[in-house]
Regions:
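Extended, hydrophobic alpha-helical segments in both membrane/secreted and soluble proteins
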Residues: 106, 113-120, 124, 128, ...
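N-terminal segments that mediate ammonia production and transfer
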Residues: 1-113, 121-163
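PRPP/pyrophosphate-binding module of the type I phosphoribosyltransferase fold
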Residues: 153-209
């Protein structure tokens, strides 16, 4: 069953003698399943290895979470027929379309900002680069800790600079979104401390107020 407003996806997969259901369409592809279809908002089905029976048809109204494409979604997933990675390229392209800033490099705040930055770089003609690398094995997402000082520490410790791509450079960074602003603030301060000449920020999603 999918939630009645369709805020989160639910997709069905199939192969000979088996069926599956998953939040992410990529989850079962390496297991030999192919995508059968997505459930509509509020739709309820009964599955067996050989069939799918609709118990409650989908309703017309949908309020799917747009954050799936800009942030939460895995790059190889599709939601409502739209591939996440392709949507992020398009978002970056649109950000660059009417932008007139001059920079040396375009970069994304890893990981989900990276695809947006590639789209921006492709449209603008400015080269894509990775002025810092994210180190994540021991650090959670920076917005998750309840304490602000811990959020600041996490955001700081995750970023490892590439000095030759920062010092004296004009940089344009794209982040997927602004939730608490912790990662963005720490990123900008980090880049200036590392010798950046200019730092321009473009969020792929409007700030959450």
């Amino acid at each position: 069953a999918r939630d009645k407003m369709g805020r989160t996806p639910l997709v069905l997969g199939k192969k000979d003698g088996a069926r599956c259901a998953s939040f992410e369409s990529f989850a079962y592809l390496n297991l030999g399943y192919s995508e059968e279809r997505e459930l509509g908002p509020g739709e309820v089905v009964f599955m067996t290895p050989d069939s799918v029976t609709v118990k409650k048809p989908p309703q017309n109204e949908m309020k799917i979470c747009a954050f799936l494409w800009t942030y939460y979604g895995y790059p190889t997933s599709s939601y409502e027929g739209v591939k996440v990675e392709k949507m992020r390229y398009e978002c970056g392209r649109l950000l660059a379309k009417d932008d007139d800033v001059e920079v040396d490099y375009v970069a994304g705040v890893p990981d989900s900002g990276t695809a947006h930055a590639i789209g921006y770089a492709n449209q603008s003609g400015y080269p894509f680069a990775r002025p810092f690398i994210k180190y994540t094995p021991t650090w959670p997402r920076s917005f998750m800790p309840q304490n602000q000082s811990m959020r600041n520490l996490v955001a700081h410790m995750k970023l490892i600079p590439v000095d030759a791509l920062i010092r004296g450079k004009r940089l344009l960074f794209i982040d997927d979104s602004i939730v608490r602003g912790t990662q963005m603030r720490e990123t900008v301060e980090f880049l200036y401390r590392s010798g950046a000449k200019e730092v321009h920020i473009r969020p792929a999603c409007p700030p959450i107020m």
